[in-house]
Amino acid sequence: MYVVPSLESQKGNNFGSSEKYVRYMGKDSDGLLFDNSGNFVSVDDAYKKIDEHSRGGIRNNEARWYSPVYSFSEDECLHVASLILTNGTIYSRNITTFDDLNQEEKYLYNEKIRELAYNFQDEMAINFNKQNLGINDCKDVLWFGVVENKRYYTGYDSAVINKKAKQGNFKKGFNTHIHIVQSRKALNEKRSLISPMANARAKT
């Protein structure tokens, strides 16, 4: 599993408001994101908190927020699915995509993925190496996340370029990933500037 913290979101640069990116995050989640304490919040609340917290002390040409994406391999997705099946196995039931799970299993699967999100964000907070400033875990960082289980082909995919798939179609198989938006400023007393870019491709 790899984390790729985007310096600049494809949905707009991160020098200004996070609204456009956060609305993109909420498009398939009923407009709800989970926060650093395990609660669900609206898209409006999320981007307003990020924007308000990120004001002041940052130059106009510097990032105010970041958008890490945690992407899982198909084998990792199948492993998580095998942990939550209510009956049978992924092999006996021929589980190959998220849509092969029943409603209860989909809920349990997403819960497991959210648990991993908190683990990954805890590790990121530790890797800032600012424990002396009060940054110890994910609760010391202002962030919001959403789990997505589908990916679409884009014009940049080789399958589209080679005319083996159409742009906009769903990709087959498990495609679970976690979108995160997080403030450049931590939640410690000094609101220290933090950046995941030092570990732009860190294996977790």
Name each region found by the language model.
Residues 1-204:
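N-terminal nicking endonuclease/strand-transfer module with a His-rich metal-binding environment
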